[in-house]
Amino acid sequence: MGCATSAEDKAAAERSKAIDRNLRIDGEKAAREVKLLLLGAGESGKSTIVKQMKIIHEEGYSEEDCKQYKPVVYSNTIQSMIAIIRAMGSLKVDFGDGDRTDDARQLFALAGQAEEGELSPELAAVMKRLWADGGVQGCFSRSREYQLNDSASYYLNALDRLAAPGYIPTQQDVLRTRVKTTGIVETHFTFKDLHFKMFDVGGQRSERKKWIHCFEGVTAIIFCVALSAYDLVLAEDEEMNRMHESMKLFDSICNNKWFTETSIILFLNKKDLFEEKITKSPLTICFPEYTGSNTYEEAAAYIQMQFEDLNKRKDQKEIYTHFTCATDTNNIQFVFDAVTDVIIKNNLKDCGLF
């Protein structure tokens, strides 16, 4: 009888040890799993960050992948030109050269007939002539007064290359493409022995109700803000300033009960566009109380302060802020390295090892 009991005890002890071992392995695995939520208003650069993760931490975009983006590059380019020409009508801007009126008609006719993924030599030539026109350039410089893709000038300045026979989009062309994110896009990659799951959530207002179930167990939130949106209004609401909308959203995320334990990383993005714009368009458009100079350093620091001041739990919660240019791979690589170090440090703290 005694032998049977001790054999059972031994088996139970082995089972208990195995359970403990599995729990420890699961615990270590969980500690190495990082869930990142990418949040921010529409067109703040979230999807570009995801593309950069594919370039930096995965195999990047193969030639075949890049070819798939050709229709998007062409569509973005054509739609940008159409948006500028339409705005000339509403803003009452005349062409520098009267002959361009005929080109504008041609643009609409040819764009309507264009095959997806094609840019005919005729359409490219029409767009090139229009883009070189003084009136079109004047209207482009007023793009804050209407909705225009950030990449408009990047693509329109490259029309010869885009229209060349055998054109294949470059990684930079791919990074610059704009497609509205609907739903949730999930990306997985490994970096510094951590397994990342990154969730990109549609930023437009209509998408926000889909976020909530992603919130639980999130390690960190990367909140993207388009610095250059300080003088723009929303695509969904012509009355609402984009920067104010971003601040409202950041306030609701930063002080949300779901995120008491979550690291919040703030990406003040599109710093390159902001640096270009701030000398021509004063920050007082967005912040009438601002009395500083319209230099990049001072204006950017003021915006950073506006966001960080929204944090109601400064004593317990730190906001980790970075100035970023999502289309610059080196910049994002450097910043993401720093972000990962913060995540590792906070993970160690949670385990009582720091």
Curated annotation (Swiss-Prot):
Coiled-coil annotated residue ranges, if any: none
Lipid modification (S-palmitoyl cysteine), residues: C3
Chain sites annotated for binding GTP: 40-47, 175-181, 200-204, 269-272, 326
Region of interest: G1 motif: 35-48
Annotated region described as G4 motif, given as residue ranges: 265-272
Domain of life: Eukaryota
Chain sites annotated for binding Mg(2+): S47, T181
Keywords carried by this UniProt record: GTP-binding, Lipoprotein, Magnesium, Metal-binding, Myristate, Nucleotide-binding, Palmitate, Transducer
Annotated region described as G5 motif, given as residue ranges: 324-329
GO molecular-function term, one example from the UniProt record: metal ion binding
GO CC annotation terms, alphabetical: cytoplasm; heterotrimeric G-protein complex
Region (G3 motif): 196-205
Family: Belongs to the G-alpha family. G(i/o/t/z) subfamily.
Protein name: Guanine nucleotide-binding protein G(i) subunit alpha
Source species: Patiria pectinifera
Taxonomic classification: Eukaryota, Metazoa, Echinodermata, Eleutherozoa, Asterozoa
